[in-house]
Design a protein with these regions (language model features):
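Internal alpha/beta core interface subdomains
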Residues: 1-34
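Short, surface-exposed acidic
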Residues: 18-22, 69-73, 123-129, 208-217
Length: 243
């Protein structure tokens, strides 16, 4: 049954002819046998398809799309690959498989959660997909795609995840393309902001004993610092400590 997936990949990359009707019937007749293949093997074959040199041409072949979506129903949003500009194409083809799959599986439903459940992927990649999913949902509710919120992502996560978020929305949000490309360029050489306040500083300056209250106070200071464009005065720190 792996031959079905390998045929799809071969046809996508090399064939210049149409699928024969007889072969279509054979594949459709045997498609249920795919369930006998392990999820690890299926994921490996899917990676090969996604990293194929002609991957972005996939939607031009209705039969390929039909069979791939029967095998991988989570790929219901393959139409996202239609009408991409050169910037969007470059982002997709230059990124790794898990970024590519995130672009396809994330929507308003639990589709991406089901993909994570079905396939055995690392916790790092699970968290990566979940971050993109959560940010996508938040952005649907209200426009949170601002420079300040991107700074927060950089501070709370890392540069790689920030790039994921920006790249994801460049591909998915054609209406804001110029703004998103500017954000990408702006953050290219930026480092995460640093809060120059720690537990030792608070205990020594305000004569506070070590304990849970120090941690709670630090969290309040950090929140104020983040909400205020990553700035906080000595007066505000004192106010929070003594509140």
């Amino acid at each position: 049954y792996l031959r079905i997936l390998r045929y799809l990949r071969f046809f996508l990359n090399y064939s210049k002819n149409d699928h024969s009707e007889n072969l279509k019937k054979i594949i459709r007749k045997n498609i249920d046998g795919i369930s006998k293949i392990s999820s690890e093997r299926l994921l490996d074959e899917l990676k090969k398809i996604f990293k194929s040199k002609k991957f972005l041409n996939l939607n031009k072949d209705k039969f390929l799309v039909e069979i791939i979506q029967l095998i991988f129903p989570q790929l219901k949003n393959l139409n996202i690959l239609n009408n991409l500009n050169e910037t969007q194409k470059s982002i997709i083809t230059s990124n790794d498989f898990f970024f590519m799959i995130s672009v396809i599986i994330i929507d308003e439903t639990d589709n991406s959660d089901y993909f994570i459940y079905k396939f055995n992927i690392s916790n790092e990649q699970k968290n990566r997909i979940k971050l993109l999913y959560n940010f996508y949902l938040e952005n649907l509710k209200k426009n949170i795609f601002t420079e300040h919120n991107l700074w927060k992502i950089l501070y709370q996560n890392n540069k790689e995840l920030l790039n994921d978020v920006i790249n994801f929305h460049i591909v998915r949000d054609k209406s804001s393309l110029k703004k998103l490309v500017k954000f990408k360029e702006f953050f290219r050489d930026k480092e995460a902001p640093k809060l120059n306040v720690n537990a030792k500083y608070i205990m020594e300056k305000f004569n506070i004993k070590e304990g849970p209250s120090v941690g709670h106070t630090l969290k309040k200071i950090e929140k104020q610092w983040m909400d205020n464009q990553f700035k906080i005065s000595e007066e505000k720190i004192s106010e929070i400590v003594n509140s």
